Amino acid sequence: MLCLPLFKSHFSFGRSILTLENKEENTDNFPDSIFPLLKQAELKELFLVEDHFSGFLQANKNCADLGVKLNYGLRFTVCDDFKDKNEDSLNSNSKIVVFAKNLKGYKRLVKLYTHASTEGFYYEPRTDWMVLQKIWSDKDLLMAFPFYDSYVFNNLLTNKICQPDLFTDHFYFHEDNDLPFDDIVSNKLNSMDVNLINAKSIYYAKKNDFPAYLTFRCMSKRTTLSKPNFEHMSSDEFCFESWRQANG
C-alpha cells in the first residue's frame, strides 16, 4: 500500500458525505457508504479519523459484523491552556489525531472528548497538552499529526504560535492533494527528520462527487458556493477514487 486511506464519515458534521451504513454496494441516488469502498479495494481494515464521537458505535458494530478491523481516531484541537478563553489563545490552536489501541484507549478518548466539549469548549471543543498528558497512556493511545492544521502547518502558513508538548512517540501524516501549499508543508516535514506515513484523507467516493461535497459543506456552515470560505477546498483529490489511482 503506497499510502494509507484515512476515511471520515458524515458523523464529522459537515466534513464528509460518506456514511457508515452496512451495505453490500453503493448505488445512485443514495449516499455512498465507506464499507463498499473497502470491499472494492479488498481492504480488511478501516482507518477512521473523525471530528465527532457520535459515529463510534455504528462504526464499531458494522466493522465487527463485516469482519473489518477498526482503527478509530479522533481529531482534537489542542491549545496552550484550555482555561484561557480569549482571542489571543486561538493563536495556539492546532490539530492532533489520537487513536485508540484498545478498549481502555476508547475510554480514555471518551474522557478527552468529554473534557474538550465541556470545560475546554471555546468556539469548538478544545483541550491542552497538560490535560492530554494527564489522561494519556502509551499502552492505550497513539498520537499522530494531520498534514493539514497541525502545529507544523499552522506555524508555517498561518502565523500561529503553536508550542506542542511532544511527550510521547508520534508520527506525521504526509499527503499530496494538489494544493498549492502541499509542497511547502512536505518540505518542512522532510527537513524535520520525523516519522512520516503517506496518507490520503477521504471525504467522498469519486472526483465528480466534489460539487455535492462542497454543497453539503456550504449547507452545514450556512455559506454559499460562490463564496464558501473553506480552507483546502480548491482540490477534488480528497476522494477514494484518487486513493485507488495512487495505489495502482
Say what each PLM segment does.
Residues 1-248:
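Phosphodiester-processing cores and adjacent nucleic acid-binding clamps
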